[in-house]
Each structure stands twice: as structure tokens, then as C-alpha cells.
Amino acid sequence: MIVEVPGQYNPKNVEDEVREFWHREDTYHKVRRLRSGGRRFFFVDGPPYTTGRIHLGTAWNKVIKDSILRYMSMRGYDLKDRAGWDMHGLPIEVKVEEHLGFRSKRDIESYGVDRFIEQCKSFALRQKDEMTEQFKSLGVWLDWDNPYMTLKNEYIEAAWWTLKRAHERGLLERGLRVVNWCPRCQTAIADSEVEYWDESDPSIYVKFPVEGEDNTYIVIWTTTPWTIPANVAVAVHKDFMYSKVRAWRRDGTYEILIMATDLIENVLKQGRYVDYEILESMRGEDLLSLTYKNPLQDLVPAQRDIVHRVHLADFVTAENTGIVHIAPGHGLEDYELGLEKRLPIFCPVGEDGRYTSEAGKKYEGKYVRDANPEVVEDLMERGALLASGELVHRYGHCWRCKTPIIFIATRQWFIGISELRDQMLKEIERVSWYPDWAGSARFKDWISNARDWCISRQRYWGIPLPIWICRSCGAMDVIGTAAELEARAGRPVEDLHRPAVDDVRLRCSCGGAMERVPDVFDVWFDSAVASWATLNFPRDEEEFRVWWPADFITEGHDQTRGWFYSQLGASMVAFGRAPYKSVLMHGFTLDEQGRKMSKSIGNVVHPEDVVERYGADTLRFYVLSSNAPWEDLHFSWEGAMNVNRMLNILWNAYRFPLPYMVLDRFDISKADTSKYDLRPEDRWIISRVNSLAKEIEENMSGYMLHRATRSLQEFVLEDLSRWYIQLVRPRTWIETEDPDKLAAYATLYNVMSTLVKLMAPFTPFLAESIYQNLVRGLDPSAPESVHMCDWPGYREDLIDKGLEESMSYVREISEAAANARQKGGRKLRWPVSRIIIASDEQLDLRDLLHVLRTQTNSKEVIILPPGEKPEMNLEISVVQKKIGPVFKGESRDVVEALTSMNPKEVKRIIESGEPLEWKGRSYMITEEMVEFREIPPANLIPAEFSKGTVYVDVSLTDELRAEGYAREIIRRIQDMRKDLDLKVDEMIRVSVALNSNEVVDLVSGWRDYISSEVRATLLRIGNDLDLEGELTKDWEVDGVKIRVSVARA
């Protein structure tokens, strides 16, 4: 049976009790078993890295997922909802290196790769367990007992199988490419793993001496002096105009410089030349015959064997000098041009970011970025430095260790994504994107520029590339499964990680031994295969056939170039189609000012801090309702507080009828609203809750969680708490088992039982708590959990839009009447004789007049016919500029007449065309000579609403005063009942002493009403009473002093 609940919503207590209930009853698994056999809904959890505690962004991400999955479950769907964990890669390695105090790969090798791998595995598993508990504390339901983990052998097989598929399709190749390189981690990193921020770097103009022409130089500009030792060519644009310029220095000497014509002034200013003349101009293509020398060739012996030429390139821009320094070993565009022109791919830099012996003895062993000043000095000593300075620009850094990246040419493994680009663009058109522009614009743009995917990494903790190469003949095999590997190796392989898999040798068809390449997969390849790996494919082909592809995924907008992209690329390789049907892209979490959360700024908000202060349901509802999912969330403590306040109001609305229901032994047999003659307000709230369900369904179909939750919030605050509860409250105080009271109980029960089901996906704890008491308390045969209930849906036959519209006008009129009362100095507790409603439209409020009377506390509600107004007073003002020219010297008399007469009489005279008679003279007054303004009588106070004006009659009679004082006394006694913490049905004895005999006489006639309202067995009212009681308080109302004493009867 139902029980009363505490007066204040305590989220910690509620959520702890619900967690214990879910755990004790194994509710999650019961829900999943209940829905098994329903229509399938395959969700793939974008796996977070197991590197630390969750942050506000990951909390928001999981709340979005959980809310959608809970909703789909209540709609009857059979969910595939395995939690996912990304447990490989640099994110884990760097954390473990920090823990062990390692600074480089050399430290790992010395420590032992096997021991390092075990440390990584232990760290990843330990963090997974901690993060699981954090997500659970938010009420997130996923299959936590059976998550997919990228470190498991069965998951690794999915990646291996996919790479073998790439090999079979001719999409896997190995080659020398320029890649983003982290010299600390000593591995290639993906474009999406490069983080950019502003940094200061050298900005230098360098002169390359032209061969065969004395004192003539090609001028280039660069921010990477360390790449000059690797320069092999320069590039110009075929359509740009270039010039040979004789430029004079202050000492009278000159040089001949070659640069873009439009940039001469700026370049010479940088070099502090004092004058110049253009010797000749030509197009870029006319420079192709020139050759030059690298100014550092005496320090870099390899440069002496390179013929340095000028080449054409479309990527050259009309900036700096209009000529680009080309180092194919250190630039993406440089590399592409190098392949096209068959230039040497000269890269004298090792994996640790230090110059190799190819850079010459002077530079060998030096870290390239540290060598910038030395290279600049060497250029200056050789007369090759035209100008130098500093430039602040955006520069890329390793996403994990924050080291500035460099570009170097290394041998890597690639998947030919560029060959699949057109197919990928077609596939994304089949996907439903939320919002649409996430796919049609942002993702489409990214795919349109897709390059081949560098899948290899020179690290340890990752999925090993399943590529074995014969040491004898160079043949290559790609292994697709553990079973295939064991069959080829002739022995079991228990762990597919390094170093165990490194020791596996295969027999080549030539008789030689095949060894595995040492690289591991790019960690993005791990999560790229999630949609089939989570189905245990390729081991379980039937599960894959039944469920794949995913019905829904959602992640932040950075995953446009991350997980959304890697999944699509891998799936196109493996299956030739997109791995997902619908994608919701959500935003980032920022602070209230729109700044990224950062420890250095001190603006980080931890989800556990919000939960500690306001509870998990508040955090959930706040992040869902604050803005559209695809917009960035600007976290506000005030916003979270307002949501908490809303949940408090919901709790009070739920709590309100409980004492009365308990007292009256209300049971489920009385909860059928069809048994009662419902009032219009009952039918209205039932209509509203059905309209609410309809709105939520429409919004959830487009993943507009913000609209769904805002509709709930508006219903709770406006419809339920501020309106219906106020309308129904007096009916719950009726002593007898009155049908009208039971109708109110039944309506409240049905509305609340529907509301908690609508709230369940978003505030699962509070919804469960209310459901267990209110619904299960009345009906033990109801489903065991609110999350085992079917989605309530809506009944069109119960939605009455006409009634909803009429009630909205009633609410507007009530608010306008309250505003008029305030202007007229009449408190709402004091009754008024009448309100008058004037509108140009026909308002059908007949069925709601009783609501208007009670909510405006008026004895009569008058609705005037359309266009009519109450009888008004008229004010008149003369238009002097119209009177003067007509009446000239008599104008003063005319104005005196108009302002002295009754304005209504003046108006009658003008409308009738009669002359105005004044002091024996007649004057013809026309309409333009006066202006009339209608004003209500002093007792009628107007206030506007959307359809017209409400007039409140604030005149007082003794009867109205008597009722007003009676209501004031009732309110004080009710407050004192709360102070004494009395139960609803406890009777009291009351004494009321007033210092006004007039008010004593007025109130005495309301003695029975006051006693009934406050449940008093004895009520004494007088002027000079001897007061005794448990609690006595003094009050003052409109100058009348009141002393009230209350005691239990």
C-alpha cells in the first residue's frame, strides 16, 4: 500500500534506495529478458579510453545513450547494448610510462616489453572497473557484465579479419610516406590525433644561390629552419608573375633576388634593402630552367649529389615570397610533388626526432626543433639569411604526450581508402544524420578529402598487425583469425598481444621462415571494427547476420573525423557498406562563458560534484534539457539548480495527495477515471498528459531530447504543480467519501502514473521511486519496475485541444486578474465581487467559469459579448491647432466649454451634428477638434491578456471584508499546523484574539468555515482573550493585530 513520503526531495536517499532495489531484484536483466523477442535495436557504444575518471563530456554522452535506450526498451525493442571500452594505444601507454617514470622507448625496451604490456593491461582493466562504477552511479544501464573490450582475443580477431579482407581486395600496401610523427612516442599518429594550439616559431627568409648566375638568389620563406638541410627543390605557381630584382643595401652593394612580383615590397622590407629595380618579369613556368645550390651543402654532404630545380605546383600561394621550399621527406604536399617529379625523398631525421648521419656531422644527433637556432646561424654565416624573426601560429602536437609533431618520411602500412572515397560518399547518403548537416556538410567534406589510412604504429600496447613476411623470399601473408594462426604455427597461441605473438614463426611456401612485422594497429582501427567485433564476428556469423549493421550510434562532433570516419572506412573495406543506420552527433561541454574546461583556468566541473550536490537525475535532466544535443553545452550551476528545483516541485506534486489517499484508504479499485463524472479540469489534465506523451514521441523520433525534456519540465511546473494541484486541492479536504474527491484522486493517480513512465528514460531514479510507492503501492500486480512498463503512449480520444486552448485562456485571465489586483492593492486572498472579461473574439469558457471564479477569488465572472466593454468614463482633450483657426478670438470660450461639460454630452453633440451651446453662443464642433479617451471607473482595474482585457472590481463590502479576514486567519492557522508538524487528520483547538471589535464581528460569521478548513474542534474569536496553547504567534493584517494560539485537541 502507499505510504507518505518525506516533505523534501532528498536525491541521495532516493537514488541509493533505487540502486539497492535494482541490484537486489536484478532489474536490468529482467528488463532485457522481458524485451527479448521484440523488434531488434542494435546500439554500438563508442568506447571511451580507460585512462582515468569520467568527465562531464563523457557523462553527457552516456546519459544521452542511456535515455534513448531506456526509451526504446519501453517501446518494446530488444536491445543489443554492450558497453564498450577502448583499452589499447598511446592513451594507455603514456599513462603507464608516466607511472613508471619512463621518457622514451628505450626505457620500455630496458624494462621489458612483456612486463610493460602487463602493466598496460592491468592499468586498462583497473580503470575500466572504476569508470564502470562512475557510469553506473549516473543510472546508466548498459550490458556492463559483458562489455566488448579491445584487448580481448575475440575482439583482436575482428581487426585481423578486416585487415585480411583489405589484403584480399588489394587495398593493403606498404610504402614510404610522410606522416605526422611524435618524436617522444616515436610513432606515426593520425590527422585526427593532432591537437593544435598557438606557438611561437622562427620565421625566416632564405636565399638559395642560382647556379650559373652570379650574385643571384631564389628567395623562400619557412617556419621550420630544421628542414633546410633536407631541401631538394623549390616550387612556383605557373600562373603567378615573378621578377628578378636588383636590390641595394645601405652600403651600396646589391643582390639579384627572384620572388613573386606582387610580394617584392614586403620581402625587401623584411631584408631592409633601401632600393630596388625590376630587371625582368616572367611567369612561373619560365623559371623551370633554373637550378640552385642548397646553402648548407658544405655541412650536409648528401646535398652535393642532388640537383636542385624549380618545379610547378598548384599549392603555391601568393604569400611571403610566392616560392615554396620543398623537402619531400618532411611535408605532405612536398612528398606528393616529390613522387610526381621523381625527386629524392631525403629524410635525414630518425624516429626520435634527431638528425641522422645523413644530415652531416655538425647536425647529427641533435633534436631537430632544438637545432633551429643553429641552422639559422649557419645560414647567416653563409650569407643565405635574408631576414629572420618570430611568428605565432597554430602548430600541431601529439594528442597524448603534447609533444610538437614533425613530418618525416617512414615506411608504413596503408589501406587505400582514397580508392573507396566515391563509394563512401554514396553510403553516407543512406545514413540518417542528426542533425542533417552533420552528414551532408561536415562529414561529407571530411570524406571528400580522405587520404589513404596509415594503420601502422611503432608501439607496443595495441593490436599487432597480423602480417608475416618471409625472410627468404619476401612473401607476405595476412592472418585473419587465431585459429588460422594456430593452424599455420602448429601450436596454440593464448595471447594475441606483443610480445607473445612476435615469437610466432610461420613456414613460407618457399621453405623459409616468416616473421611478424613489429608494428601494431593505429588505435582508431580498434574501435573502427566495433560494430562487428561486439557481435563476436568472425567467430559468430549468425549473430552478425541477425543484428548488423547498427541501428544507432552517437558521439561528439569531433568523431566526424574520428570514430564515425574510421568505422565507415573499415566497414567499406570489409563489407562495402556503412556500419550504422543513424548517427546522432552531440556537442562538447564548455563552461558558462563558452570556454573549454581546463585545470589551468580552474573551470572544470566534475560530474560527481554535480551528483553530490543535486543528484544524478538532476545532472541527467539538466544536460539533456539545456540545449539541442548537437550544440555545445555551456554548463551552468544555476541551470542545474533550476532543474533540481523542478524535481523538488515534482516531488511535492507527487507527495501532495498521499496523506489524503492514505487517510481515505484509496485503492486501485477506485482509480478508474471512467467511473466518475470528471470535472472539466480533470479532463483537461488528462488531455495535457496525453498531449505530452505525443510531443515526447515526436521529439524522440528525431533524437531531440532537449525538446522532450523541456516539454516534461513545462508540464510539471506549469500544468501540474502551478495549476491542476491548486485546482484540485480543496477537493481532497472533503471529509466524506465523495465521488468528486475520488474523481480527483483517480485523476491524480492516472496522471502521475503516466508521468513517471514518461520521465523514466530521463530521470530513472526518481521515476522508479515514485512508481514503487504510488503505482506498485496501489497495484501490486503492476510490473515490478517502471522500466519494465510499456511506454504509455497517448490516446487521441483523450486529447481535447479545444479544452486545452480554453484552459490556456483561463490561466491567462487568472494571471491578468492577479496583475490587476496588484495594481489595485487587493491581495488574492481577499475576494472581489466580480471580474469582467472583454474580448473581440468569442471565448468559449462556459465549462470553466467555476475555475475562473476560484482562481481569481471572485464572486462573479462576466464575459461580455465580442467587441463590448464595461461602461467606461470618458476623458476629453482639445486639439488647439484645430480650434484656433476656426474660432479665432472665441477659441478661449470654446475650450472652456469643452473642458467644463460632461465628455459624454460633448460626444453626443458631435455625433448628432448639433451645435454646442455656451454662454448664449452656438459653436459647431467637429470630430478632429477633440480627442476622447475611455477610462474605466476607479473601482475597475484593467489588465491585458492575449485575447483582450480583464477588469477586476476592487470595491469592498462588509461581506467581502469578512471573508478576506477569515481567509487571512485560516492561512495563519495552517502555517502553525505545519510548525507543529500535525498530521492531516489531527484536530486542534484554536483561539484568535483581534484588536478590532469591528473585525471580530465580521469574522464571527465565518466561524464554522474557519473551523472546517483548519480542523478545529474549538474556535474562540474575540478581542480580549486569555490565550493558551502549544504555539502562539502574533500577526498583523491591514493594521489589525491578530494573536493566534493553537493546541492539539
UniProtKB/Swiss-Prot annotation:
GO terms for biological process: isoleucyl-tRNA aminoacylation. Its cofactor is Zn(2+). Monomer. It catalyses: tRNA(Ile) + L-isoleucine + ATP = L-isoleucyl-tRNA(Ile) + AMP + diphosphate. ATP binds at K599. IleRS has two distinct active sites: one for aminoacylation and one for editing. The misactivated valine is translocated from the active site to the editing site, which sterically excludes the correctly activated isoleucine. The single editing site contains two valyl binding pockets, one specific for each substrate (Val-AMP or Val-tRNA(Ile)). CDD domains: Anticodon_Ia_Ile_ABEc, IleRS_core. GO terms for cellular component: cytoplasm. Belongs to the class-I aminoacyl-tRNA synthetase family. IleS type 2 subfamily. It is an enzyme of class 6 (ligase). Its EC number is 6.1.1.5. A motif ('HIGH' region) lies at residues 48-58. This is Isoleucine--tRNA ligase. Catalyzes the attachment of isoleucine to tRNA(Ile). As IleRS can inadvertently accommodate and process structurally similar amino acids such as valine, to avoid such errors it has two additional distinct tRNA(Ile)-dependent editing activities. One activity is designated as 'pretransfer' editing and involves the hydrolysis of activated Val-AMP. The other activity is designated 'posttransfer' editing and involves deacylation of mischarged Val-tRNA(Ile). One of its GO terms (molecular function) is tRNA binding. Keywords: Aminoacyl-tRNA synthetase, ATP-binding, Cytoplasm, Ligase, Metal-binding, Nucleotide-binding, Protein biosynthesis, Zinc. SUPFAM superfamilies: Anticodon-binding domain of a subclass of class I aminoacyl-tRNA synthetases, Nucleotidylyl transferase, ValRS/IleRS/LeuRS editing domain. Gene3D superfamilies: HUPs, Isoleucyl-tRNA Synthetase, Domain 1, Valyl/Leucyl/Isoleucyl-tRNA synthetase, editing domain.
